[in-house]
């Protein structure tokens, strides 16, 4: 009886061990607000200023060359500046929870820390949204975010 049990158990163990040993890793799912997909053209994303000038955080995502996704938001702060940052906390980014807006604050969905909109994209390090560019380029009524800038936030979503 023990021999039959052992012979039935060995194939099951081998299947379970080797089924998870592929060379590809499964992408982790982003659990925060993904927002609108933005296609990259000529190594940049352009977003109409009038689409993001209402004081409400607008969430976006794109896929970098190679397929790595990045998630970000743009918000016009009370001081009148347009600000872009990763939708991932520099400390809690690995949780893939992102941020949400409460009035004039962005709130980390993981730790609950609040960040004034006027400070978004101005500070590196610590527990705040990772900055993309504190001086967003606006040309012909559009915001431009470059591939290199988006590569700078990639690590928060792997």
Where are the predicted features?
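Bacterial signal peptide processing site
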Residues: 22-24
């Amino acid at each position: 009886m023990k021999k039959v049990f052992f012979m039935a158990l060995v194939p099951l163990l081998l299947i379970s061990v080797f089924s998870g040993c592929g060379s590809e890793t499964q992408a982790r799912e982003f659990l925060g607000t993904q927002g609108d997909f933005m296609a990259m053209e000529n190594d940049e994303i352009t977003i109409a200023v009038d689409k993001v000038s209402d004081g409400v955080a607008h969430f976006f995502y794109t896929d970098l060359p190679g397929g790595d996704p990045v998630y970000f938001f743009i918000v016009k702060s009370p001081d009148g500046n347009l600000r872009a940052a990763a939708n991932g906390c520099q400390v809690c980014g690995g949780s893939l929870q992102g941020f949400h807006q409460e009035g004039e604050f962005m709130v980390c969905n993981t730790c609950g820390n609040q960040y004034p909109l006027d400070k978004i994209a101005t500070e590196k390090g610590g527990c705040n949204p990772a900055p993309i560019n504190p001086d967003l380029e606006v040309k012909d009524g559009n915001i431009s975010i470059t591939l290199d800038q988006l590569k700078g936030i990639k690590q928060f979503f792997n």
